[in-house]
């Protein structure tokens, strides 16, 4: 994951008097996911925790990466990973995905059955782009968010 991109977003946000959410540690992640018994929990603990230990979700210029709601005061709103996956999973065909985030036109997901990271067109759920890893997906997501902010 590109820490440089997160640092650039942090500089942009600070220019508006905003801050990025504080990171959360692995123990807190496990504590917050203890009541979940599904692929979303496994994905968070095995993959997405690396991002959450840098920043607990992101809401930047219409681009959102889901985080975990904590009892702590966050500097910005956190779009809860479990809440949003529960919402998207109300549609049966969406249950094959773990939803990582979204922007105005796309969802960013992990396809459980194919072990793929994807950008999906929001209205149609057609594949826009495939990524080799979560890090590649996050780098593309963050780069695009910065580009749209310019």
Predicted regions and their residues:
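Glycine-rich, often proline-containing surface loops adjacent to acidic residues and nearby aromatics
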Residues: 31, 117-118
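Compact, glycine/acidic-enriched structural inserts
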Residues: 126-148
């Amino acid at each position: 994951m590109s820490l440089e991109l997160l640092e650039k977003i942090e500089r942009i946000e600070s220019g508006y008097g905003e801050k990025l959410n504080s990171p959360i540690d692995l123990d807190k992640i496990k504590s917050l996911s203890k009541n979940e018994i599904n692929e979303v929990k496994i994905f968070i603990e095995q993959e997405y925790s690396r991002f959450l230990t840098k920043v607990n979700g992101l809401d930047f210029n219409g681009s959102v990466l889901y985080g975990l709601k904590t009892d702590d005061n966050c500097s910005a709103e956190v779009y809860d990973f479990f809440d949003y996956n529960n919402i998207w999973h109300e549609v049966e065909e969406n249950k094959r995905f773990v939803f990582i985030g979204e922007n105005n036109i796309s969802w960013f997901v992990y396809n459980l059955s194919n072990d793929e990271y994807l950008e999906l067109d929001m209205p149609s759920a057609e594949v826009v782009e495939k990524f080799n890893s979560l890090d590649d997906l996050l780098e593309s997501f963050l780069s695009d968010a910065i580009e749209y902010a310019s």
